[in-house]
């Protein structure tokens, strides 16, 4: 009985490692534990530490993000703006020679002047679109409100008269001409009974008027007044 108790006491419990077995089976385990125990306690890591921080390369530059170029804003003087606006009013698309000439006058670089003209044209197009945008939403009925009403118009136009149909004159013979006496112009004698009697015509139709009398031409040379 005593021998069995000794055997059970010598057997290690489940889940525990005997201290006598460590040096024999794992001789380096003791040194490892002593090194861990003798080291300083581990630093406590703050929550979120190191998250979202950019990494830097050994050369000192930021890794993973390209360097963004910083834009320099040019400030124009009132005199320069006046010269640029005057040139823009003459020509909105100046060539290289016009830009170089303007650069000498204003003291700016040709590249700055080219960028200014591009921005100025974009600004003008934006202003034109803003002016045309309210008119695009108007309906045709809204446009009629801008027109004057017919009652307010000071002028009134009468409707055109109906067309009149002319019938040929019943007398188609030529008028009798009288011989000229003394070489002077002689008007033909027109009697009162020369005009024909108007015959009744259908309603809405009038006869054509008679042709005008023809005057004879004189062949004698014109007399001088001297």
Curated annotation (Swiss-Prot):
It comes from the Eukaryota. The lineage of its organism: Eukaryota, Metazoa, Chordata, Craniata, Vertebrata. GO terms for cellular component: nucleus; transcription regulator complex. Belongs to the paired homeobox family. Its main location: nucleus. Residues 1-13 have a biased composition (Basic and acidic residues). Residues 64-74 have a biased composition (Basic residues). InterPro entries: HD, Homeobox_CS, Homeodomain-like_sf, HTH_motif, PROP1. It is found in: Nucleus. Possibly involved in the ontogenesis of pituitary gonadotropes, as well as somatotropes, lactotropes and caudomedial thyrotropes. SMART domains: HOX. CDD domains: homeodomain. The keyword Nucleus applies. GO terms for molecular function: DNA-binding transcription factor activity, RNA polymerase II-specific; RNA polymerase II cis-regulatory region sequence-specific DNA binding. It comes from Theropithecus gelada. The keyword Nucleus applies. Residues 69-128 bind DNA. Residues 1-75, 181-226 are annotated as: Disordered. This is Homeobox protein prophet of Pit-1. One of its GO terms (biological process) is pituitary gland development.
């Amino acid at each position: 009985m005593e021998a069995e108790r000794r055997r059970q006491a010598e057997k290690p419990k489940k889940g525990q490692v005997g201290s006598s077995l460590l040096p024999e089976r794992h001789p380096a385990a003791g040194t490892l534990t002593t090194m861990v125990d003798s080291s300083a306690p581990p630093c406590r890591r703050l929550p979120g530490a190191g998250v979202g921080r950019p990494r830097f390369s050994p050369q000192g530059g930021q890794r993973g993000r390209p360097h963004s170029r910083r834009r320099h804003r040019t400030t124009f003087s009132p005199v320069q703006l006046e010269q640029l606006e005057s040139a823009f009013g003459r020509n909105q698309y100046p060539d290289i020679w016009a830009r170089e000439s303007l650069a000498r006058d204003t003291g700016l670089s040709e590249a700055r002047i080219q960028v200014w003209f591009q921005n100025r044209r974009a600004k003008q197009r934006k202003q034109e679109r803003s002016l045309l945008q309210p008119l695009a939403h108007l309906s045709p009925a809204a446009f009629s409100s801008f027109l004057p009403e017919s009652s307010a118009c000071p002028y009134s136009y009468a409707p055109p008269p109906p067309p009149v149909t002319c019938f040929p004159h019943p007398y188609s013979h030529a008028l009798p001409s009288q011989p000229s006496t003394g070489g002077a112009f002689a008007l033909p004698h027109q009697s009162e009974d020369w005009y024909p009697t108007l015959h009744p015509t259908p309603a809405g139709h009038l006869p054509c008027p008679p042709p005008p009398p023809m005057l004879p031409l004189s062949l004698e040379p014109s007399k001088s007044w001297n």
